[in-house]
Amino acid sequence: MKSGAGVAEIYEPNFGITRFSCFSGIKVCRLDGRTGKPMGTPPRLHTVAARPGGAPIEAPFVVRHNDFFYLFVSFDHCCKGVKSDYKVVVGRSRNITGPYIDIAGRDMRQGGGTLVIAGHDDVFGPGHNSVLKDSDRYWFAHHFYDGERNGVAT
């Protein structure tokens, strides 16, 4: 994975997540394989996830498994300690440009997403995840705020 300047290159050659905004949605575009920068002037952006009314969505992460791409994003509000309501949702697609659909058949461009993790017990605002593969196992990494330690970030 390469990253920098708002661009993260993922598992599909020459495609990347770019120009994502907490309030305008997550977009992908083709990248120049040599420079890693978006291709085209302007680049052709594909919206892959958004929320109605500009509700917060950020922290995209895409992983490919078998014939599907899985798009993980964080919904709601981070960085408020024990008042954080951040959560992670996921959808999948056969194409990196979408559409990404959740388990209930909802399109992530329309606010869909299957809940992966949300706050519980003394865990507040889990989000901004990554998925790592080690041999044949996948690991889900994320941050959260620890309610047992007055909202310390972990």
Task: Write out the residue ranges for each language-model feature.
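Carbohydrate-active catalytic/glycan-binding domains of CAZyme proteins
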Residues: 1-154
